[in-house]
Swiss-Prot record:
GO terms of molecular function: actin binding; ATPase binding; protein domain specific binding; protein kinase A binding
Name of the gene encoding the protein in the UniProt record: Rdx
InterPro entries for the chain: Band_41_domain, ERM, ERM_C_dom, ERM_FERM_C, ERM_helical, Ez/rad/moesin-like, FERM/acyl-CoA-bd_prot_sf, FERM_2
Residue ranges with Basic and acidic residues bias: 376-400, 437-447, 455-464, 506-525, 537-555
Name this polypeptide is given: Radixin
Amino acid sequence: MPKPINVRVTTMDAELEFAIQPNTTGKQLFDQVVKTVGLREVWFFGLQYVDSKGYSTWLKLNKKVTQQDVKKENPLQFKFRAKFFPEDVSEELIQEITQRLFFLQVKEAILNDEIYCPPETAVLLASYAVQAKYGDYNKEIHKPGYLANDRLLPQRVLEQHKLTKEQWEERIQNWHEEHRGMLREDSMMEYLKIAQDLEMYGVNYFEIKNKKGTELWLGVDALGLNIYEHDDKLTPKIGFPWSEIRNISFNDKKFVIKPIDKKAPDFVFYAPRLRINKRILALCMGNHELYMRRRKPDTIEVQQMKAQAREEKHQKQLERAQLENEKKKREIAEKEKERIEREKEELMERLRQIEEQTVKAQKELEEQTRKALELEQERQRAKEEAERLDRERRAAEEAKSAIAKQAADQMKNQEQLAAELAEFTAKIALLEEAKKKKEEEATEWQHKAFAAQEDLEKTKEELKTVMSAPPPPPPPPVIPPTENEHDEQDENSAEASAELSSEGVMNHRSEEERVTETQKNERVKKQLQALSSELAQARDETKKTQNDVLHAENVKAGRDKYKTLRQIRQGNTKQRIDEFEAM
């Protein structure tokens, strides 16, 4: 029994370990990996390894693993990575697992600066990555510093700007708050939709020379072949869509591309090593096949996958809506509870105030009763005094009469009697005046007593009203709203060729009509422009890279990925090949 071989496969978010037999093929290992991770969109992916010479290479699926130049380690090391990239992520990436693997791979490439990303776009992408990781922003949970341990921006961007970690976090958080309600998988898709508009996204670069010996870059991607000057990987100068290419072949280091246009000459370039030509051929075949497949009706399998993905997404949206509904109900219930508690406190306070008013009113009533009693006593005294004075007046009158009588009877003592009469007359006048004064006082006291009695009756009535009044009604309750394998060829083979068929394909070059994601969204476009201006104030100009300079020139000239694509494909194939030869 042959001894099994240990294999470790690292995906973007997991490490898988297998034991394989010495006769296990690359396809058998690949199938085991995709089955383990639950992936059905296998045509984008491959297994990458480092060979004995230190070069990164794709595992050939039609050969045994042991017959390939995998670096001898225990276990054997492989990376499960996207080998081919879609033209439009939102149209082509169906399964959530596929979307997540692409998201993680592209994010890593941007953070490592393998894909150039301008600073303001890096902040926007970081906010989608944060939404994908943390969900909706919640200030109760996401306290300042919640992003301190996350790697969210390329080191280049951090070093170029005089901003603290807190200032970067604030800018990312502002956008994170705007993504409220966005599902995590939708956040990954939004990230990819922005990232796919970056010039270096999905491009495999190879060093080549034309017949003149000029050092250039060949870019192989989902849309075709592009030629770049050696100091500019952002802006291709000449482009050939896959629909213009009939045959690709190489002989040793010479690579020949035959256009569909029979009048056009062959497109010839030279690679520094044979293995580079093998890899270019494999990538051309794979990308061309996917380019043509996209321009034909979906297979039954893809239709089924899309239907299943739609159903799963719909189910998730329903579940999320249900969760949101329950959350809202909880929030409404909590608010109702708070309202009731608040009303209870308000009623208790009102009751306390009523009790205080009652005690105060009782005290006032007692005081007014006391005053009324005093006034009554004063009135009584004044009345008695008036009666006494009246009695004295009558007695004086009687005495006057008696004296007058005596005076009449006793004329002989007239002087004495006259004096006594005058005395009594004066006394009577004084008594009359005193009586009148006392009567006025009695009248005044009587008025005061009546007023006090009225105050007493009014206070009794108010107390009665306060004691009998019902508590204020509560406010009305709130009613809630309701690979096909593309062999890089045997290492000993110094030549290979592949015919690229374009039969049955409609609308070959639809990609030339595309616009970037930010051009579609005016609000995001303005926010990016504002952030770009803001970051420019904090930028250290001495730390600008060549790509920063090139990007700034493109922005100034109004160029983007798709405008450049249309421009570099202008003219016929012959004109573009002549242009390439002249570089």
